[in-house]
Amino acid sequence: MTLKIGTRGSKLATTQAGTIRDQLKHYGRDAELHIVTTPGDVNMSPVERIGVGVFTQALRDVLHSGECDVAVHSMKDLPTATDPRFHLVVPTRADSREALIARDGLTLAELPEGAKVGTSAPRRISQLKAIRPDLEILPLRGNIDTRMGKVTSGELDAVMLAYAGLTRVGMQDRATEVFDADIIMPAPAQGALAIECRADDTETVRALNMLMHADTFVSAVAERTVLNRLEAGCTAPVAAHATLDGYSGDTMTLTAGVYALDGSDQLVFSAEGDGARPEELGELVAQQLIDAGAANLLGDRS
């Protein structure tokens, strides 16, 4: 049986799903892409206005109905609450860092005063304003080509994108600066894909399990636990970044931050813990943020 892989129709989404198709074929399972249009592809309003799950719910609906056998999501878009209808597999993560694409090869520090920078992500807006309060931050939606085209046309001086997206479509050389997590922290699970199938489809569960990458899975779980504990959606100004000890992988370091949208304040905490118990570490760091007053920064966004 040929597996139908549900995916959004953008270049990035089909490229991501195509890598999963190719990996499944490598393991002897035929697969093909099944394009699904989501509300987030049609409505260009800021994501926080449309609602959590705007990119993922339509894919889950066709998966649950049996119209497709597998759904591929960007994991950072997936609601943090576990859905028992589905089995989740997380393959190897791409580079989780944030990237700037600016005119004339400029870095963030080199952008002129009052430069126009495009992004709609509150997490990016708040961190950019903390570093460069003079910048004019403008809303930005659309696919990668559309976003970068606003720089090429001169409408914007720069845009902020996930570096993983650029690398997946072969445009990593367009980045004029890539930020380490201690400069601009990425979204929880940024760079990771979430592959779902129906939990009772045992044959497909077995096939997808061959793609599981344990280190990526536990890192993403730790980061997303922070988001879940804060009761914040994927559009909240919350960032998180987990790393595993390079030698044994037994020790995980998790850093997470909550930011004021105007860049005037931030809370950032880190902790180390057992890499095999990512939820506990996520809960610990989230509690540190809560105790320090995270709710005051999240406001009615949580």
From Swiss-Prot:
InterPro entries: HemC (IPR000860), Porphobilin_deaminase_cofac_BS (IPR022419), Porphobilin_deaminase_N (IPR022417), Porphobilinogen_deaminase_C (IPR022418), Porphobilinogen_deaminase_C_sf (IPR036803). Keywords: Porphyrin biosynthesis, Transferase. Pathway: Porphyrin-containing compound metabolism; protoporphyrin-IX biosynthesis; coproporphyrinogen-III from 5-aminolevulinate: step 2/4. One of its GO terms (molecular function) is hydroxymethylbilane synthase activity. Disulfide bonds: none annotated. It comes from the Bacteria. Its cofactor is dipyrromethane. PANTHER family: PORPHOBILINOGEN DEAMINASE. The porphobilinogen subunits are added to the dipyrromethane group. Monomer. This is Porphobilinogen deaminase. It comes from Corynebacterium glutamicum (strain ATCC 13032 / DSM 20300 / JCM 1318 / BCRC 11384 / CCUG 27702 / LMG 3730 / NBRC 12168 / NCIMB 10025 / NRRL B-2784 / 534). The gene is hemC.
